[in-house]
């Protein structure tokens, strides 16, 4: 018997909604990255996008453990010499909390064409409302140890 290799037409996608309120950012990112890549499915293959859609709400209420809020820096580069910019995570969460969550998840996804396709299935919102009710998303509970 030959090994089964999933084809793009064989994959059924589901929508999950994750509430990020009081969830540690790293644990949220690993859970979302695994769902986006499809690693929770038995038909997972690294060369096929078998992942599901992920909606993250309450991104502004995400938790960073320890002193990371004041000490951890988020970097970006303009591409010009001397164009490295850094911002503390407490400033980033105050200004653009969606970007902080997207950046954490993006770091856990492969940096190639398939990774960009996987990231297009991620939707992050700072409030508790999202415009994807028509897709009937299923709530996904993140179980974690108390922080």
UniProtKB/Swiss-Prot annotation:
GO terms for cellular component: cytosolic large ribosomal subunit. GO terms for molecular function: mRNA binding; structural constituent of ribosome. Keywords: Ribonucleoprotein, Ribosomal protein. It holds the Pfam family Ribosomal_L13. One of its GO terms (biological process) is negative regulation of translation. Gene3D superfamilies: Ribosomal protein L13. InterPro entries: Ribosomal_uL13, Ribosomal_uL13_bac-type, Ribosomal_uL13_CS, Ribosomal_uL13_sf. Transmembrane segments: none annotated. Signal peptide: none annotated. Belongs to the universal ribosomal protein uL13 family. Part of the 50S ribosomal subunit. This protein is one of the early assembly proteins of the 50S ribosomal subunit, although it is not seen to bind rRNA by itself. It is important during the early stages of 50S assembly. This is Large ribosomal subunit protein uL13. The lineage of its organism: Bacteria, Bacillati, Actinomycetota, Actinomycetes, Kitasatosporales.
């Amino acid at each position: 018997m030959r090994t089964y290799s999933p084809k793009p037409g064989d994959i059924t996608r589901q929508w999950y909604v994750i509430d990020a309120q009081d969830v540690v950012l790293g644990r949220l990112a690993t859970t979302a990255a695994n769902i986006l890549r499809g690693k929770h499915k038995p038909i997972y293959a690294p060369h096929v996008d078998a992942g599901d859609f992920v909606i993250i709400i309450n991104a502004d209420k995400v938790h960073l453990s320890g002193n990371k809020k004041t000490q951890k820096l988020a970097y970006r580069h303009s591409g010009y010499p001397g164009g490295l910019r850094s911002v503390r995570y407490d400033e980033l969460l105050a200004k653009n909390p969606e970007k902080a969550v997207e950046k954490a998840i993006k770091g856990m996804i492969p940096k190639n064409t398939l990774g960009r396709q996987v990231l297009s299935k991620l939707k992050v919102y700072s409030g508790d409302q999202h415009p994807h009710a028509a897709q009937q998303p299923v709530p996904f509970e993140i179980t974690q140890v108390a922080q």
